[in-house]
Amino acid sequence: MSRKNFGAKPLTYPQPVFIIATYDENGNADAMNAAWGGISEGDELSLCLSAGHKTVKNLLKTGAFTVSMADAKHVAECDYVGIVSANTVPDKLSKAGFTTTKSENVNAPVI
């Protein structure tokens, strides 16, 4: 999957599935789907996340995350990331077929 930095834009249409990615305390990449989110300011996202998710716990510990958006070509992989918990399947990103690299901007993985 190719990556593209869209920069700060004031809209998200059609409504995407946001994929929030973090590192855990051991540096392992994790991600979750966030369907409840959108642009609240021209350069700011608002997301509704449950504290019970491992990804959210990672985010609260590290203070860093990245946001990717699902595309039609990767529906099955993105669905897997949203259904399976890293609490039970620690390597769920690789099992989904995704690879990650470290973000150049924050201490979090980019899918």
For each feature predicted by the language model, list its residue ranges:
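Active-site-proximal mixed secondary-structure blocks
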Residues: 1-32, 38-111
